[in-house]
Design a protein with these regions (language model features):
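Structure-specific DNA junction-binding interface
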Residues: 1-99, 164-299
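Long, contiguous binding/interaction regions
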Residues: 152, 156-168
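Hydrophobic or amphipathic alpha-helical targeting/insertion segments
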Residues: 130-132, 144
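Catalytic DNA-binding helix-loop module of base-excision-repair DNA glycosylases/AP lyases
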Residues: 80-87, 118-126, 154-159
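Short, solvent-exposed interaction modules
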Residues: 111-119
Length: 299
């Protein structure tokens, strides 16, 4: 006879964790609303929060036993929100929420990885300009990227811990068949809208935790919806952007299509070469060159 999973009680640690995750989803929807976000996204996160709060089995148990598919199978939980829940369960943080709250510093996130203390986390952000666990993994896999206090054995141990942590999240974030990146035209147009409105003082602002000793609300935030794409744009507040004086130039674009997981792009002013002075999407320079030349780009 098949047995059913045990049902938790109100005060069980698993259901308490469910409540905390539901509260985070609700907080995110409230921040979206206060910052002028799209109504569809606001409702999606609120509906997900309600379903999580009603759930009688711990999300952690579901995730451990069934992976991302178990989360996606829940009512009102699409792939994007499933990836967010997996991130919270795996790292204890949710970068999307941290971002809208102005808590964009990656050092605390990096310290959740075994082998990384406060000093090493700070060096990673300063020398690698790493902002996410994915950034950190990419930098550590590059043998040319050196940082003091990080020998080969420690580097390998951190990489192993990172890979194990990110593997399950990647499976959820992997694009569906037919999935695609946003067109560079969309990213460049959103970038232009953001910088124009920011310069005119027409955007809501948040107070970033990093490089803001006075706690001022200075970082403009823009939420846009275009053709099924949901975008959030902010100026970069990274250590490298501050060091190079690019905080009013580098624009971070976080976007997802419908209920898909989030992607991140950076738009900057090209400083040399044939596109000098033009805005380009890092990593997609060839597409930007075709766009600025008036040629078909695709997507």
């Amino acid at each position: 006879m098949e047995t059913k999973p045990a049902i938790g009680t109100e005060d069980s640690p698993g259901l308490q964790e469910n409540s905390r995750i539901a509260e985070q989803l609700n907080r995110y929807s409230n921040l979206l609303e206060s910052q002028g976000g799209d109504g569809f996204r606001i409702r999606a996160y609120r509906n997900a929060a309600a379903r999580v709060a009603e759930l009688r089995q711990p999300l952690r148990t579901l995730y451990q036993e069934g992976g991302g598919a178990a989360l996606i199978g829940l009512p009102a939980i699409g792939r994007g929100i499933a990836a967010a829940i997996a991130e919270i369960l795996t790292t204890g943080r949710w970068q999307q929420l941290d971002r809208l709250q102005g808590e964009t510093g990656p050092e605390d996130l990096f310290q959740t990885v075994p082998g990384i203390g406060p000093a090493l986390a700070s060096r990673f952000t300063e020398q690698f300009d790493a902002q996410t666990l994915e950034d950190l993994e990419t930098a550590l896999r590059n043998p040319r990227m050196k940082v003091s206090g990080l020998g080969p054995r420690r580097r390998s141990a951190i990489l192993a811990a990172l890979s194990g942590r990110l593997e399950a999240i990647r499976r959820i974030r992997a694009p569906r068949r037919g999935g695609h990146e946003p067109p560079v035209q969309l990213l460049l147009e959103a970038d232009a809208i953001y910088r124009t409105r920011a310069a005119a003082g027409k955007l809501r602002t948040i107070a970033p935790r990093r490089f803001n000793p006075e706690g001022k609300d200075w970082l403009p935030v823009l939420h846009l919806t275009r053709g099924g794409w949901h975008l959030t744009l902010l100026f970069s507040n990274s250590a490298r952007a501050h060091a190079l004086g690019r905080t009013a130039d580098w624009v971070l674009v976080f976007c997802h299509f419908e209920d898909e997981p989030e992607m991140q792009f950076t738009v900057v002013t090209q400083r040399q070469g044939p596109l000098e002075g033009r805005r380009v999407v890092r990593g997609r320079e060839s597409e930007c060159a075709r766009y600025w030349a008036g040629q078909p780009v695709g997507n």
